Structures are given as C-alpha cells and as structure tokens.
Design a protein with these regions (language model features):
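Noncatalytic, solvent-exposed loop/strand surfaces
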Residues: 1-290
Length: 290
C-alpha cells in the first residue's frame, strides 16, 4: 500500500511515516525491524533518526498515521498513531543505541483498542479485518490543551467494525476517557471550544465533551465518510461518499443540518484558507467564498 500520511515539518526536521507493514497476504510482515516513521533533515534529506517503538513487528496493516508535534508540560513532544493500534508519545531528540542507530524511543504508549477487540472471552485472538477485531490508527492524533484525541480504524475495504475514541494525557500517557459507541474511522477528529467532533466510516458524526467524553449528539449522513470534520466559524463541515457537503451547527445542541450535493463523491477533507472554503470531489475542486 502507498504511503498516505502527511509530512510534519518542525524547524529543520521532517517527520514522515513509511507505510511499513504487511505484504499482499495481510499475514506476513516482510520487514518487521524497519521503522514505521523516520526523521530527515529538510535541507539535505539526511536521516536524523527513526521510530524506536518496534511497532512494525506487530503491524496490523500499515503505518499510515501522520505525526503530531506540540509542547506539553514544557516539553517538546511527538505523537504518533501506531500501525499496531497503540498511540505513542516521544521526545523530539533521538538516542543512539548500542548498534549505532539513532532512535526515537517512546516515553509512553497507549493501547487504543479494547482488550476484547484483540482477545475474545475464550482467550483466542480475534481475527483482524473482521467486525469485532482490533484496528490500527489511521487518522492523525490531535493535540488540544495538553490532551491527545485519536480513534482507531481500518482500510475501508474491510468494512464496518468496532471502534474507540481515546482522550490521553499528553504528558503521562494516562487514558482520561474513552468512547466506544463509535465505529471504525479513518478520519481525524476536530476539537473546538471543548467539543470533539469525530466522523466514523459508517457515516455517523459524533459530538462529545472534550473534557469528559460525554456524548451530546450524533447525526447520520447515510453515506460512507472518508474525510475529516472541519470546525470553523460556528459550523462543522464534512463531505461524504454520496457527494454531499454537510454543514452542521457547532455546539452542544442537536444541530441544524444543511446539505449541498456536489455531484461526485467527497473523499477528502474540507479546508479553509484566506476566507475561502476548498472542497475536492472525485472530479472537481470547489473554491467557495464568503
């Protein structure tokens, strides 16, 4: 599979996932010791360091999540959603190991799957790519007020399945709350005014309290969702596979929802820049002014 993450640039360093994982059989990992992400000098391309988590050896599918950077508790921190279903927190400085490799070793890691997603009640491993099975992280972890928000999901070809949205203390790695009434997602969450918005692949949008995980409302778009929500200017924007651009009111109350059909599936996420809304469908790019 392709490397489908976005590069993260911090100073003179570029952090990017490698997409390392399983082969065509989806059961064999050809390069279990290869890194899931690397850091390069943005000016020269020289390798600065690589992921030291060892996640590749336990890859469920591939390393697709983009990295996140922020200062948490006065410490520069990298956050990555793992191909093994764990979320990792790292220092921004690599350490040289005994073999001479410069590794970014995790300060903490959190399993973002429920235990029964991995092992059933009879003690047997739950098969991957089945509705009750464990998932990797594909969407980018989001940092908001020192907390990390991330959700699990799989390749859309695998269909629907169990999910989980986690809120993690970015400094300690402690799980502050979790929400399991959400299905698999490949979307990145949006957080605005202490509200979290998450869209699941099945087409349902959820709004929760960012501090407690309390659910305020859900909205079913009745179509698959590949992209991520955008919370801006009092609205929550999102496209779906039916080609609908959904416009929901931002807030705790059940939202008024408007839709504009763009004539082709929307697999991307809407973007606002310089007062213009950009939405890409499978056939067109729309630029919508104020």
């Amino acid at each position: 599979n392709v490397t489908s993450s976005s590069a993260l640039i911090v100073g003179d360093r570029v952090y990017v996932a490698t997409s390392n994982g399983v082969d065509w059989s989806h059961t064999n990992i050809p390069s279990p010791l290869s890194p899931s992400w690397v850091a390069l000098d943005k000016n020269t391309g020289e390798l600065i360091g690589e992921d030291g988590s060892g996640a590749s050896a336990s890859a469920l599918h591939a390393a697709w999540s983009s990295l996140t950077y922020g200062v948490i508790g006065g410490e520069e921190t990298l956050i990555w959603g793992g191909t093994d279903g764990f979320c990792y927190g790292y220092s921004t400085q690599p350490e040289r190991d005994e073999d001479g490799y410069d590794l970014y070793n995790p300060k903490w890691k959190v399993d973002c799957n429920e235990p029964h997603y991995r092992i059933d009640k009879n003690g047997k491993k739950v098969p991957y790519a089945t509705p009750p099975g464990s998932s990797e992280l594909i969407g980018t972890p989001v940092l908001y007020k020192g907390k990390i928000y991330c959700a699990i999901g799989q390749d859309p070809e695998h269909g629907d399945g169990v999910g989980r949205l986690s809120c993690i203390d970015g400094k300690t790695g402690n799980v502050l709350w979790k929400y399991t009434d959400v299905g698999r997602t490949i979307s990145t969450v949006s957080v605005l005014d202490d509200l979290v918005y998450i869209a699941e692949y099945a087409g349902i949008i959820h709004c929760l309290d960012a501090n407690t995980g309390k659910l305020y409302w859900t909205h079913d778009s009745f179509s698959r969702i590949w992209g991520s929500t955008l919370a801006v200017a009092g609205k929550v924007l999102l496209g779906n596979e039916d080609g609908d651009l959904l416009i929901l009111d931002h807030g705790k109350k059940e939202p008024e929802v408007k839709t504009v059909n763009l004539g082709a599936p929307v697999y991307s996420s809407p973007v606002v820049a310089n007062g213009t809304l950009y939405v890409a469908t499978q056939t067109h790019l729309y630029a919508i002014g104020e």
